[in-house]
């Protein structure tokens, strides 16, 4: 989604040319890739693992299924899906950022996750897969970084099989004022300092906090998924809406 013009969009709180955003986001993730897993644990106090576990459970992957872990980064979801779909299944870990893919591939191979996992560098707005290909698509903490979210959702809907399910796990909008104030304090005062201390990169974590605030709220994203052709769309708030899991189906 743009900020109201056809050739501009947001990068955090900044307005930039739409065709520049992907490179700017790439710079952020090239910078943070090596410390990404450590920072996730520290930033969320480990709660991100519970959010991802719930996403995996909600996905309902079974042996033999084809799963796309889009913006899959360092492979947390891919590792779990690989075990669930088994030897007859397939998991594709796709990410636009080659630094994140390299970290994810090395991590999963160290864990012994091989055989039914492949790695693809791909732009979510134009997925390089056939129509009606995947039983399940997940995108965890990635949609907010996409320039044209509507195009990405349409692309995901296209490559889902009829009966397939899309799950979007993303930071969202806290539901209560006290939580909103605490979350703002944490995001804008504490998080960048963590980024500087652990990853020597305060700027990238300032962007991440800003990108969360610019992401569509729960009901807006639900409407965007419906507009992309997904049906029976709903969402589940977690941690008072700090994170929401949206799900939709293709029939």
Curated annotation (Swiss-Prot):
Its EC number is 2.1.1.163, 2.1.1.201. Disulfide bonds: none annotated. Transmembrane segments: none annotated. The keyword Transmembrane does not apply. The keyword Lyase does not apply. It catalyses: a 2-demethylmenaquinol + S-adenosyl-L-methionine = a menaquinol + S-adenosyl-L-homocysteine + H(+); a 2-methoxy-6-(all-trans-polyprenyl)benzene-1,4-diol + S-adenosyl-L-methionine = a 5-methoxy-2-methyl-3-(all-trans-polyprenyl)benzene-1,4-diol + S-adenosyl-L-homocysteine + H(+). InterPro entries: SAM-dependent_MTases_sf (IPR029063), UbiE/COQ5_MeTrFase (IPR004033), UbiE/COQ5_MeTrFase_CS (IPR023576). S-adenosyl-L-methionine binds at residues 74, 95, 123-124. GO terms for molecular function: 2-methoxy-6-polyprenyl-1,4-benzoquinol methyltransferase activity; demethylmenaquinone methyltransferase activity. It is an enzyme of class 2 (transferase). Belongs to the class I-like SAM-binding methyltransferase superfamily. MenG/UbiE family. This is Ubiquinone/menaquinone biosynthesis C-methyltransferase UbiE. The gene is ubiE.
């Amino acid at each position: 989604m743009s900020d109201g013009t056809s050739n501009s969009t947001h990068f955090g709180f900044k307005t930039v040319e739409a065709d520049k955003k992907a490179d700017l986001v790439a710079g952020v993730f090239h910078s943070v890739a090596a410390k990404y897993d450590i920072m996730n644990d520290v930033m969320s106090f480990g709660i991100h693992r519970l959010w991802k576990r719930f996403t995996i459970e909600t996905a309902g992957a079974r042996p033999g299924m084809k799963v796309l872990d889009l913006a899959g980064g360092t492979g947390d979801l891919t590792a779990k899906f690989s075990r669930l779909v088994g030897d007859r299944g397939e998991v594709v870990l796709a990410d636009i950022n080659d630094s994140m893919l390299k970290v994810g591939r090395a991590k999963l191979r160290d864990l012994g996750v091989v055989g039914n996992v492949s790695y693809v560098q791909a732009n979510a707005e134009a997925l390089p897969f056939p129509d009606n290909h995947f039983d399940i698509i997940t995108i965890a903490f990635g949609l907010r970084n996409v320039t044209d979210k509507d195009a990405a959702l349409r692309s995901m809907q296209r490559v889902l099989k009829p009966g397939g399910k899309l799950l979007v796990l993303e930071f969202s909008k806290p539901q209560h004022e006290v939580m909103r104030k605490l979350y703002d304090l944490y995001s804008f005062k504490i998080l960048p300092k963590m980024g500087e201390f652990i990853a020597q990169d305060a700027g990238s974590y300032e962007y991440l906090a800003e990108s969360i605030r610019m992401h569509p709220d729960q009901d807006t994203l639900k409407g965007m998924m419906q507009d992309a052709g997904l049906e029976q769309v709903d969402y589940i708030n977690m941690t008072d809406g700090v994170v929401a899991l949206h799900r939709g189906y293709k029939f």
